[in-house]
Amino acid sequence: MKVISSIQELRDQLRGQNRTAFVPTMGNLHEGHLSLMRLARQHGDPVVASIFVNRLQFGPNEDFDKYPRTLQDDIEKLQNENVYVLFAPTERDMYPEPQEYRVLPPDDLGGILEGEFRPGFFAGVCTVVTKLMSCVQPRVAVFGKKDYQQLMIVRRMCQQLALPVEIIAAETVRDEDGLALSSRNRYLTADERTEAPELVKTLQRVRESVLGGERDLGKLEQHARAHLAERGWAPDYIAIRRRANLIAPSAAELEAGEPLVVLAAAKLGATRLIDNLEI
């Protein structure tokens, strides 16, 4: 595996490749990330991964400076997955001058849910993903369903900007107790780690209620938030939305069996966790 930090060197290395599969990451890789590499290999060759902790998507009170950086361990894991190139640019490589041009998602998709609680986050994501795709020029790119809203925004962005990249969705990888794998799980204390699976259990109960015929979605969302709050969580949102556009479904759409997803974000201690389940 070649480890490259220069954009020009990356382009030189990939010149002539027309089936490249790309997996962008921020590093601190776990089994969830590695599953993305394996899925990428099913859809293209060679597989290119990137590791870049993107300052643009962190808010002023978020964890950019303490976000775990484990490059040497990550390199070993990617080598074991037979990744062809790891693109690991420095901040100077990616942003040699202030990044004044940004890619802004529409408010109806980028300003809700995560966008409401993390203003500027999706503009940072869209900007860096567009720039990375310009560097790699892949045929396909793999994103995880764990970041459901991000997946939808990136897919829509590629459609709207006519980027010739197919976005592949990867299923969420979970620990045995159901907790979705995340680089931020390492922030949890032992007691918090024991409690953390309650988030997905809460979403499972919401899903079961909807599938069982409950149509008062607002009541379900409120009860789920209250349940987590009683257990010491600080929920930002629990929302049942249409999979197609993350808009709340109408009564007619519910009766017609509209595909739904329930999404959640909540703090447990100092750690903010997100998760979702399709319904």
Curated annotation (Swiss-Prot):
Catalytic activity: (R)-pantoate + beta-alanine + ATP = (R)-pantothenate + AMP + diphosphate + H(+)
Biological processes, Gene Ontology terms: pantothenate biosynthetic process
The keyword Ligase belongs to this UniProt entry's keyword annotation: yes
Binding site for ATP: 26-33, 144-147, 173, 181-184
Residues that, per the record, bind beta-alanine: 57
Pathway per the UniProt entry: Cofactor biosynthesis; (R)-pantothenate biosynthesis; (R)-pantothenate from (R)-pantoate and beta-alanine: step 1/1
Annotated EC: 6.3.2.1
Gene Ontology cellular component terms for the protein in this record: cytosol
Origin superkingdom: Bacteria
Chief location category: cytoplasm
Keywords (A to Z) from UniProt: ATP-binding, Cytoplasm, Ligase, Nucleotide-binding, Pantothenate biosynthesis
Annotated GO MF terms: ATP binding; pantoate-beta-alanine ligase activity
Top-level EC class as recorded in UniProt: ligase
Localization (cell): Cytoplasm
Miscellaneous: The reaction proceeds by a bi uni uni bi ping pong mechanism.
Family note: Belongs to the pantothenate synthetase family.
PANTHER family referenced in this protein's UniProt entry, alphabetically: CYTIDYLATE KINASE/PANTOATE-BETA-ALANINE LIGASE, PANTOATE--BETA-ALANINE LIGASE
Function of the molecule: Catalyzes the condensation of pantoate with beta-alanine in an ATP-dependent reaction via a pantoyl-adenylate intermediate.
Name of the protein in its database record: Pantothenate synthetase
Species: Burkholderia vietnamiensis (strain G4 / LMG 22486)
